[in-house]
């Protein structure tokens, strides 16, 4: 390229921060206007004042029907012998080199707002012209600002945004490519000036900061209404704190689902910020720099995760994977401009006095008739043993052996509690116990373990095996011998095991092979905390593996190389993703397993308490978003969901090793024994001072 041309092409905007037009009124400013035209040979002049005067005449005499001739006569008369060139104002827009001839402010406002009447009366228009509006954030805020300017809902507007207009913004911000690289507040101010050069616009091109906050809110008179549309959590909170202190109402449009939020600090000076949804958080901390992760607890209640649209939720799940930022559509932003602009006008005119959050969801309002949802597969009925069934079972089982003991209730309760402390998939605890005729009966409660992904109850068998192991170990700790009979009656498939307790060992009683693990029953737990991987203590796995081998038909293998652990992490991560996007897997996990609150976990005493899963705030927010099956359906359709691979994969990579328990006979008895071996391995690891995190998605 020619160097001269290259130099010319790299020229910058001579006035990137210019946004106020220059107003010339003749004849007073005639010399200045002549100088301008002489100095700007490329200036473009637009003079259609005669047509504006004709419109003005009609606006001032709405009951009169004018012919073309009579209208022209009336327009000339209105000029009162004044030169047309000296009537009104000449407006120069330096950023576009345009000179436009317009009616002066009062008459301009009459004509420009004439079509507002009487949705907005002239008296109301006069009230609106006294209002000062502040707008923070000029993406959605640009739509709100321009909409308010179109209706002339303010006399002064203060615009705050530090960001510049990028090409990717043009999917929703009404502007031209010639404005790329300009500050968004400047772009909006120029558009307002080109609509109405008489409106007062003040730009804060550093955005709203602690340093300029007083000027933004109070300089030249307090704001009447604040429109908050920024992305910064700290500014959202600081701006509301300032608005509350000054008694200024706050309006916010969230764009998604036509969500509109209003806080009337003018009418409710004691109203909590964000309707009280962030009262539990440290609002002082919000004023300090925060990481993206630290912002999450603040953003969750502000954005309303539960009320996001399915497509927004699905897009959030893809952040950092297939999309780079929160999506926004022009239709949503334009709708938001209308909703917020309408609300600001009605607040300014005292026609609306409420606080709250509202939704104008076009996808719900303008929608096809809903088709009935297919009913979810029914679960087995709740487990119940009637007296007649118990009597019949006792007849089938016959009397207990003569050496069986009649245990005190306290002892039975200790045995049952120990059994109930066994691990189970999803912590569903698929067991029921009955003490009768000197024997403890263990039943499989299918209503608790029902899963379409496990139709033959393989996972439940492993959990029941762990339960059996705990009962045997606890009995040994209490000084009893145990004779256990597994799967004793094919006519009663839910009856999994029968335990008799004796004073002395006899043929068929349980061997005392891992009794030293009994104290670990109550200590065993899942630990999902991350730690730097370290080699296992010398001989630890050999001792753990020996505990597994004491169960016939069971063995264990160890993975401890970083390469193997990384491969396992990838495998389990992919399995987690498949499970999460599968409708059945999703429903069973989010509807049946997850316990979202401490209260729910305490009340149900089962399921997965999220508080124990060591989730970061950002991961917890992701879980809340992912709980919507509509979002997951979209994620699957887009072939996304990579984020689900991060549920277990990072924990595996940060672990020292992984152990796999195997069985030789894959039948129900083999699975029960495998469950016992798994429990032995887990407690043996805890006894070695090792934390354990179960992973099973890749298997099942």
Please provide the spans of the model-predicted regions.
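Acidic, surface-exposed loops and disordered segments
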Residues: 352-700
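Glycine-rich phosphate-binding loop and adjoining beta1-alpha1-beta2 segment
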Residues: 160-196
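Mid-domain beta-loop-alpha active-site segment that forms a flexible
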Residues: 325-348
């Amino acid at each position: 390229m020619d160097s001269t041309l290259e130099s010319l092409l790299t020229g910058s905007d001579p006035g990137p921060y210019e946004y106020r037009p220059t107003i010339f009124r003749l004849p007073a400013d005639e010399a200045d206007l002549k100088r301008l035209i002489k100095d700007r040979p490329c200036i473009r002049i637009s003079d259609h004042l005669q047509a504006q005067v004709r419109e003005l005449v009609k606006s001032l005499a709405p009951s009169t029907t004018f012919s073309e001739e009579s209208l022209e006569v009336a327009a000339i008369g209105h000029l009162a012998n004044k030169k047309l060139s000296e009537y009104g104002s000449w407006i120069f827009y330096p950023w576009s080199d345009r000179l436009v001839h317009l009616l002066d402010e009062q008459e301009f406002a009459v004509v420009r707002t004439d079509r507002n009447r009487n949705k907005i009366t002239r008296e109301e228009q006069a009230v609106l012209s006294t209002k000062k509006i502040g707008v923070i954030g000029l993406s959605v805020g640009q739509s709100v600002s321009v909409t308010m300017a179109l209706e002339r809902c303010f006399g002064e507007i203060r615009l705050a945004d530090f960001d510049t207009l990028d090409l990717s913004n043009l999917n929703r911000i009404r502007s031209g490519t010639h404005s790329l690289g300009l500050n968004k507040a400047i772009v909006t101010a120029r558009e307002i000036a080109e609509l109405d050069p008489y409106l007062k616009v003040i730009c804060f091109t550093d955005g709203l900061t602690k340093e300029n906050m007083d000027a933004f809110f109070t300089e030249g008179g307090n704001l009447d209404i604040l429109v908050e549309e920024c992305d910064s959590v700290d500014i959202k909170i600081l701006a509301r704190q300032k608005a509350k202190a000054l008694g200024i109402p706050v309006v916010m449009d969230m764009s998604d689902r036509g969500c509109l939020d209003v806080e009337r600090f003018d009418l409710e000076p004691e109203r909590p910020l964000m309707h009280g949804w962030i009262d539990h958080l440290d609002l002082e901390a919000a004023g300090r720099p925060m990481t993206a992760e630290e912002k999450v607890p603040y953003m969750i209640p502000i954005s309303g995760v539960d009320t996001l649209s399915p497509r927004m939720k699905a897009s959030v799940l893809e952040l950092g994977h297939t999309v780079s930022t929160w999506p926004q559509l022009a239709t949503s932003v334009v709708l938001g401009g209308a909703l917020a602009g309408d609300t600001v006008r009605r607040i300014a005119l005292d026609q609306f006095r409420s606080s709250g959050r509202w939704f104008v969801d076009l996808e719900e309002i303008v929608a096809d008739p809903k088709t009935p949802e297919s009913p979810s597969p029914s679960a087995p009925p709740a487990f119940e043993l009637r007296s007649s069934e118990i009597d019949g079972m006792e007849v089938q089982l016959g009397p207990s052996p003569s050496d069986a003991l009649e245990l005190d209730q306290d002892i039975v309760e200790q045995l049952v509690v120990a059994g109930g402390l066994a691990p189970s998939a999803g912590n569903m605890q698929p067991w029921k116990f009955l003490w009768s005729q000197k024997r403890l009966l263990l039943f499989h409660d299918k209503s608790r373990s029902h899963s379409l992904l496990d139709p033959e109850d393989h996972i439940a068998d492993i959990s029941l095996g762990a339960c059996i192991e705990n009962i045997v170990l606890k009995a040994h700790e209490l000084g009893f011998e145990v004779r256990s009979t597994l799967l004793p009656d094919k006519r009663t498939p839910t009856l999994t095991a029968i335990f008799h307790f004796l004073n002395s060992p006899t043929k068929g009683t349980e061997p005392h092979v891992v009794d030293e693990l009994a104290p670990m029953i109550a200590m065993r737990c899942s630990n999902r905390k991350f730690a730097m991987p370290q080699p296992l203590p010398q001989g630890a796995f050999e001792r753990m593996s020996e505990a597994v081998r004491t169960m016939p038909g069971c063995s264990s293998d160890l993975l401890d190389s970083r390469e193997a652990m990384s491969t396992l992490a990838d495998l389990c991560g992919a399995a987690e993703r498949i499970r999460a996007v599968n409708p059945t897997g999703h429903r069973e996990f989010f509807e049946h397993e997850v316990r979202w609150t401490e209260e729910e976990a305490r009340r149900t005493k089962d399921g997965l308490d999220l508080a124990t899963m060591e989730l970061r705030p950002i991961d917890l927010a992701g879980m809340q978003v992912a709980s919507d099956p509509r979002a997951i359906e979209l994620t699957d359709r887009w072939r996304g969901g990579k984020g689900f691979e991060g549920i277990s994969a990072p924990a595996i990579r940060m672990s020292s090793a992984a152990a796999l328990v195997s069985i030789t006979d894959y039948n129900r008895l083999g699975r029960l024994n495998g469950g016992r071996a798994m429990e032995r391995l887990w407690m043996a690891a805890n006894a070695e001072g090792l934390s354990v995190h179960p992973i099973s998605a890749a298997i099942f």
